[in-house]
Amino acid sequence: VLTMLKAALRVLATATLATAALAPTAASASPTAPIPAPAPAPAAAAPALDTAPCGPVGAYRSWDWWRTTTNPLIADTVRETAVSERWQWRHDTNTLWRGDTRENVTDLFEQGFTPRGDAMIPLAEYIVKGGGQNSAHVSTTCEKWVAQKFATYGAAKTGWVYEIDAPGGIDVNATAALNRYESPYLWNKEIDFPGGIEGRYIKQACKFHLTKTDPQTKVNTYENLGCKTNERFRPERQAGLEMPAQR
């Protein structure tokens, strides 16, 4: 009897092991088993910066300069430098923009954008060291977002963007390409006015506050805090200056 009992137990144990081997595991049998998460998609890269010219360009046109300048005393220097540096002069009439953190908007409407000094610093040097130099150059841009960036650069992240309707100006990117100038700031898409811009060419100014910057694309979002219209805006009126004979 004992021998028969042992034999029966061996048969039962063998059957149990076979059943366990054939049974599915809990993980494979459960319909709610976790599925490995896919690898995260690579972050979107910021778009390449545009360093092309703003638009059509050509030879320097002194009449444009005489209409816009706030400092006619540097006319001879401007004319000579236009030749020696082979300025590529802006020939379109598209809107220009300038970012400014100063709060004296009404004064700027009246006085215009006057340069910090009279020195015609070489353009190749000016476009590397920036607008804080004591020079006759005054910067604008053909891209509104660039002006917004400069206007909100300070700690307050708030500033004014001026809308400008003025003829001429040096297309910095076109001139840099022709002369092989190098600068990390060609994304500024700058139109430079040697001698400044009269206030009558400023159409309006709007105040912007930087609210956020996308961490991946670096694109900024701004809040418009309001605009001021320049009652002296008269871009079609002649400057009333007698242009001296060319020498």
PLM ranges: what are they?
Residues 7, 36-247:
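NAD-dependent ADP-ribosyltransferases
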